[in-house]
Amino acid sequence: MAGLLKESMRIKMYMEGTVNGHYFKCEGEGDGNPFTGTQSMRIHVTEGAPLPFAFDILAPCCEYGSRTFVHHTAEIPDFFKQSFPEGFTWERTTTYEDGGILTAHQDTSLEGNCLIYKVKVLGTNFPADGPVMKNKSGGWEPCTEVVYPENGVLCGRNVMALKVGDRRLICHLYTSYRSKKAVRALTMPGFHFTDIRLQMPRKKKDEYFELYEASVARYSDLPEKAN
């Protein structure tokens, strides 16, 4: 429940996985305000550094995976905050237009004033001469996730654009969010949108990265036609 969450919450993240067969581990620490929808994270690669691929493909598993820090307007039930103290999980498949695929599973739990994230990722089929494996990407454009409930699961569908020089590499994201609480204990939100701006203000030698995200959940601003 939202009462367990404070205006300032800490974050700890533990990530491991492979991308095109390269094994790595990352650890992150950060903080944010769950009620204003802003968060920051500082991430170190603890194994497998320097990464031989663009960290940009992992960034959405960190911040865009940190769904407690989404500002929900008053009329939208907050699925994620309702899920505490038990927490929630999500699974995501990201398909890039050049054939690369990234799958991820994340577990979110709460320990005192700290949110704990455990993330496992698997990246396959990224072209050796593509921008991901050549580390030629330059961050993400802002995007909007379409969110809706289905059989007790919150589904997210998104199209993201990775900046590559003067062009964009497009990818499609399919996410399933599952509360650890029984569905009957939740008030599920209706169809809505989540606007996301994910940035990387700083990185160092492909082994240290700083991320910032702002996100807000909203209904459509467009009025319905009167009868």
Swiss-Prot record:
A biological process term (GO) from this entry: bioluminescence
Effect of residue 122 to H: Produces a dimeric form
Entry function: Non-fluorescent pigment protein that is lilac in color.
Domain of life: Eukaryota
Practical applications: Fluorescent proteins have become a useful and ubiquitous tool for making chimeric proteins, where they function as a fluorescent protein tag. Typically they tolerate N- and C-terminal fusion to a broad variety of proteins. They have been expressed in most known cell types and are used as a noninvasive fluorescent marker in living cells and organisms. They enable a wide range of applications where they have functioned as a cell lineage tracer, reporter of gene expression, or as a measure of protein-protein interactions.
Other remarks in the entry: In the wild-type form, the chromophore matures at 20 degrees Celsius. Mutants have been selected to mature at 37 degrees Celsius to make them suitable for use in vivo and cell culture.
Organism: Radianthus crispa (Leathery sea anemone)
Protein name per UniProt: GFP-like non-fluorescent chromoprotein
